[in-house]
């Protein structure tokens, strides 16, 4: 419905301010296996720079594959810049990142756990939960997939009885974006680097001229711990409020506040087909059971709830 789309676009523009950009090619990467394959291929093709921002970078098989490949590209003259979160990578030994630095890669720890190492006001809960890979300022990967072997399995997993998080495949989704909107994602990376007082970046073509690669319209929306409210959340609430036919959400850590709860129930009440795909188990028992405490109200309000079996759902998507 064009009227609904126009209304949503106008609301987003008023709330966010970032442009809606035409000329992009968006490719759905439906699981960790396809995401890593696409990322590795793009990294190998990099000619100028690689910017990686990830909440978690683990010292496991996948993490070491990334490290080896990034170091190889750095040796070939491609500047690699990496941001990782101090809490997300708390179990990753310092030697892992020291090896990257020794190879010439610029590495920035977001909001170090040690307050004495912080270069700005220190707040323990200020975390960088982004997962962004940027190649030559023209290709971007965004979504829920961290750098960790738990995402390595494909999307078709066998049903298993165990729910141990270290033995169950994690189900997640990424997008590959080629085209002009990548410059907006690059700005988000640069903004984080600057606000965290990272070392001076090597002079590279971080914002090259970008040509249209497809016909997809894309708006990049970023939120940070410094923001007074989440722009992403406001966009989601407004989209649900404008929905007339269907709302489909997947969420790994679904603990709706009163506003989101009301938005979903109100949508179902006006005849919208509201469907939630949520985890059947989680790496956070507290969050899992807190989310389930809202099931009765949602179901009573006409919202349909499904639980993902056979894998640990980590996706956060909305249609």
Residue spans for each PLM region:
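Glycine- and other small-residue-rich loops at beta-strand/loop junctions that grip anionic moieties
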Residues: 55, 85, 252-253, 287
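N-terminal localization/anchoring segments of enzymes in phospholipid and broader phosphate metabolism
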Residues: 1-234, 238, 242, 266, ...
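C-terminal structural cap/anchor segments
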Residues: 271-273, 280, 284-319
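Residues at alpha-helix boundaries and short interhelical turns
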Residues: 91, 251-254, 307
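Helical hairpin unit composed of two closely spaced alpha helices linked by a short loop
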Residues: 243, 252-275, 279-284
